[in-house]
A protein has these predicted regions:
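Auxiliary, metal-adjacent structural segments of Zn-dependent hydrolase domains
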Residues: 1-43, 50-54, 98, 102-103
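Active-site-flanking structural segment that lines cofactor/substrate pockets
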Residues: 44-47, 64
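Secondary-structure capping and boundary motifs in well-ordered enzyme cores
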Residues: 49-57, 84, 88
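Active-site recognition of the HExxH zinc-binding catalytic motif
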Residues: 58-71
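Long, well-structured alpha-helical subdomains associated
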Residues: 103-162
Length: 162
C-alpha cells in the first residue's frame, strides 16, 4: 500500500490546489479531522483535505475526488460524510484512478492494486476489470459534469451544478 510518506507531497499539494483544496498534514498518531473511516484514512472538511504521513495515497485521492464530484452546496457544508448517490460514488472511484496518473510515482496501475488491497468492491471482481470494462456510467457522469473531457482526461474543473 503506497503511503503519503513515500510520495511527492509537493506534487500532491499542487494537484489539490488546482481544484481549490489545501492539503493539511496531521502529526503522527493524531486523529485525522473529517475522516470517515478513522485510523490513518484521509479526512475532508470543506476545501481542506487532512492526512498523515501514514495515510494511504488511494484514500487521499478518494476524498479529493469526493470534493471534486459533489455539488457546491454539499461542498460548502462538508465535514466527514461526502454523501452522494451510488453513481456519484462510482464516479469518485473512477476519478481517483485518473488523478493517480497526475502524480509522479503513483500512477493508475499502482492505485488499482492498492484499491483492491484495501477492499474496494466491484461487480467484475477487481478494480482494473471494473475500470476497464464496467465503468462507462461513471465516465459518462464525470464527462456530463465537466470533470473529464470527451477523451477521458481530467479538466481541472469541479462539478458546478446538480
Amino acid at each position: 500500500m503506497l503511503l503519503l510518506n513515500a510520495t511527492d507531497r509537493v506534487a500532491l499539494a499542487l494537484l489539490l490546489e488546482r481544484y481549490g483544496m489545501q492539503l493539511a498534514l496531521i502529526a503522527p498518531r493524531e486523529g485525522i479531522p473529517g475522516s470517515y473511516w478513522g485510523h490513518s484514512e484521509a479526512g475532508l472538511k470543506g476545501e481542506r483535505l487532512y492526512a498523515r504521513l501514514d495515510t494511504p495515497v488511494h484514500s487521499v485521492l478518494h476524498e479529493a475526488s469526493h470534493n471534486i464530484c459533489m455539488t457546491p452546496e454539499r461542498r460548502a457544508g462538508l465535514d466527514r460524510d461526502a454523501g452522494g448517490t451510488d453513481l456519484e460514488e462510482s464516479a469518485v472511484c473512477y476519478l481517483q484512478v485518473l488523478l493517480a496518473d497526475e502524480l509522479p510515482g503513483v500512477g493508475r496501475a499502482r492505485l488499482l492494486c492498492d484499491m483492491d488491497a484495501w477492499g474496494y468492491s466491484f461487480r467484475l471482481g477487481n478494480t482494473r476489470a471494473w475500470f476497464e470494462g464496467d465503468a462507462t456510467d461513471a465516465r459518462d457522469w464525470l464527462c456530463q459534469h465537466g470533470v473529464i473531457d470527451a477523451t477521458g482526461r481530467v479538466t481541472g474543473a469541479k462539478r458546478s451544478s446538480a
